[in-house]
Structures are given as structure tokens and as C-alpha cells.
Amino acid sequence: MDITPFLDKKSKTPLYEQLYTFFKQEISHARITKGTRLPSKRRLSSLLDVSTATIERAYEQLTAEGYVKSKPKIGWFAAEVEPGFPTAPDHFQQSVQPGLHQKNAPAIDFHQGSVDPTLFPFNAWRKSIVKSLDRYSGSFHTSGDPQGEYELRHMIARFVRLSRGVNCEPGQIIIGAGTTVLLQNLCLSLKPGTKIGFEEPGFHRSRRMFEANHMDVTPICSDAEGVLPDELYRQNPYLMYTTPSHQFPIGTIMTITRRQELLAWAAETNSFIIEDDYDGEFRYSGHPIPSLQGLDPNGRVIYLGTFSKSLLPSLRLSFMIVPPELMEPIQNNVQLMKQTVSAHSQLALADFIETGEWQKHINRMRSLYRKKHAVLLEAIRSELGNTVEILGKNSGLHILLRLLFPASEEEAIQAAADHGVTLYPVSPSYIEQTPFTSVLIGYGGLSEEDIRLGIQKLKTAWAPLISSY
């Protein structure tokens, strides 16, 4: 599976030393297990946007100290570290409404929640299903662990640590049939009227879940760097919901400075942050920024993740990582609600991850979605030119298209529908008035050919709107 260290390029500590320290701690604490293959110099250099010399220097030091073994012409592998081996101290441990469209289903649907159905490795998934049936058949007569099957929670704890820098134990993880189910569980542990800060704009389904549970939802404004800390101190919510890795719907990536400011606010005010990392696997430019949870030394972040984008939306499997302070009340609700995902699906997914099939699938998806992403941007620039502005183009499976001609959201979506293209509105994501007209364009479920054709159709559909102003 992918291993993504975080390097602070503003630090006085040399980059090779930061990289060396990261791998040393991960191997020492068995979070990277014996025999795990480390990323190649070229891959890690590209991922972190540093020179291969930096990677090589770190790997050579790790090899010299016995943390890594080098196999010529093959790569570097984690070595076994003897108990008592000196180590550094560990870190703290403890769908959008459719737009207006015509009655007949349109040929091209730019839904932001769709994935490419041709990419899913059904044969590998079938093997994991059969294996889980054979291995755990004796346990399927019960409803399973209310918190989720331990085997899956163990694998999730491992991969989020390596890929997103998340610090957690399997006991902090709760499995649920979608993010909204997990938020419902969270709401049951809160008093009605609890003040929830919600990024403005934000994912309206999550907001409506809070509202349905009688929470006091308060919009918190953002800028290009993310949620505004001054607004948080002024509004003083108990919980703050945010999507820092790919802000929904605008698509900005919260800066490391702003992440640190949010964590400082939470620590100072004894508040909590809900980090919804809904498609953190897909990033197309820039060096990786670790999750808020991974940067947090104080246990103030509730982390939400999902397999809807990385596997299949129909699997309906998400997870919530809860800080120790909140575990008891949330666990009580888990016992009340029971588990909403079948034990069979959970155990099959655990095997799918353990055998490396999930990481192979992610790698393939990243490669193909990167190509689709490039095709989409090129088609927009070629066909729509300076009539639109592309927002949120560095990660995720959707972009925001800001209209630079004065048509309304409704007019733009209806014109597209009249030409066989479905677009999605942004206005439901705002609590207050939208500052500009824009539409959501998802591309994960479309072929490159359909992406090009869809944008060509948009050019034709919007031509009368553009020329009339």
C-alpha cells in the first residue's frame, strides 16, 4: 500500500533527515511491518516533490542502521527490529440533489459521486468474498461486532496511518453504512441545540443530518486557505465540520498553516473538528499534506473516511475514527443501533486490503482518473475558453465551473439538460446566498470520449446564453 510521509519544507531540519525519522519510527513501532516494500526512489521523489538524492540519502542511513534492507535491482524493504531497539517517542495514541433535467435520461451525466464501473476488479473481489465465507463461516450466524469487525478495523488503522498519517488504534474505529449513518451516531451523543460550525459552502447532506437532529448549525466562512480561524473564535462552536483535503464543493486544499490554526483553536477552546476526508486518495498536483487528525497531538479530531469513491458506492461502507474523550458516549450509541454493514462485506474488504488488491486498485484508479482529469481540463479550456473559471482542479473527482457570463444557475443547468447533459447545482451547499454562479462537474464515471463530448455539448448549449449578454 502507499506510504505517504509528511515533509515540512519550511523546517530547519533537512528533508532527508525528516524522511529518515519518519521511516525509523514507523518501522520501530511495527506500523510498517517486516518485509514491506518501501516506495521506489523515483516514486517517492515524485510524490513528495523532492530530489531522488534526498530519498537515497535517507534510505542509505536507514540501511546502515538496520531499519531497512536493500535488495539490488529490486528495492528497499523494512527489516525486523529487535524488541528494545531504541526509538523516538511515539505520537499521541488513543449524494447531491440532481439538477434540472429533461424527462428522458441524458446521455452524459457529470455526477460528482460516480466512479468508473469498468475499473473495479471483480475477480479479485470475488476471491475475497469466497475466502471470507470459508474462513469465517462459523461467525455469520450472529449480527457481528456493533463497532465493526476487528479484522477490518485493524486493516483500516494500518492503511490510514501509512496513506494519510492518521494516528489511531482499531478500538477507535467505528464502521457504518455511509457517512450519514456515522454522523447520526455522533449526533445521538450530543445534546439538542449543540452548536455545529459548518464550512460555508459545505456538503449539504451532512448539514441536513445535523439539522434533522436539532443541532444549531452555524455557517463558518472560508477563504482560499480554508476555514477562517477568526470566525471560529467569534462563533465558538463545539464541533467544526470541514473537508480540508478537497473542500466540497469548491475543491480548495486547506494549507498546512490553516490546519495548524484550526487545531490550535480546538485545543484552546476544548472543541472538536470533524474531518471529512471523502476523496483524499485522489491528488493530482503538489506535495501531500497530512490529515488534520495526523497533525493533532491533543485528540480533538473526529476523522471520517469512506470506500465509496475508492471501491463502489453501492458497498455503502464508511468509517469514523473517534478521539478517546468521545469514545464512551459514542460506543453506547453503537450498542443501541447495532452494526449497519454486513459482517460478510466487512471481512471480504479486510481480506481485499490485506492481500494488496485494494492498493493495486487505488493505484490503477489514480492513473486513469489523472488522465480523465487532464482530458476534462483540456476540453474546458479548448471549448469554453475564458467564459468560465475552473476551481478545485488539484484533487478529487469533481471540479467547480464558475460561469463568467451572467446566466443563473438554473438557466445554465436547464440549457445543458436540453442538450443531453446533466450538471449539478452548487446553491444547496450554501446556507446563505451564493456569491457567484457555478455548477458541479464530476467526471469519475465517464469515459474520456464522453467527457470531451459532454463539454462540446456544453459549448453549444451555453452559446445562446453567452451571446445574449
Swiss-Prot record:
One of its GO terms (biological process) is biosynthetic process. PROSITE patterns: HTH_GNTR (PS50949). It comes from the Bacteria. Keywords: Aminotransferase, DNA-binding, Pyridoxal phosphate, Transcription, Transcription regulation, Transferase. Residues 13-81 form the HTH gntR-type domain. InterPro entries: Aminotransferase_I/II_large, HTH_trans_reg/aminotransferase, PyrdxlP-dep_Trfase, PyrdxlP-dep_Trfase_major, Tscrpt_reg_HTH_GntR, WH-like_DNA-bd_sf, WH_DNA-bd_sf. Residues 41-60 bind DNA. Pfam families: Aminotran_1_2, GntR. In the C-terminal section; belongs to the class-I pyridoxal-phosphate-dependent aminotransferase family. This is Uncharacterized HTH-type transcriptional regulator YhdI. The lineage of its organism: Bacteria, Bacillati, Bacillota, Bacilli, Bacillales.
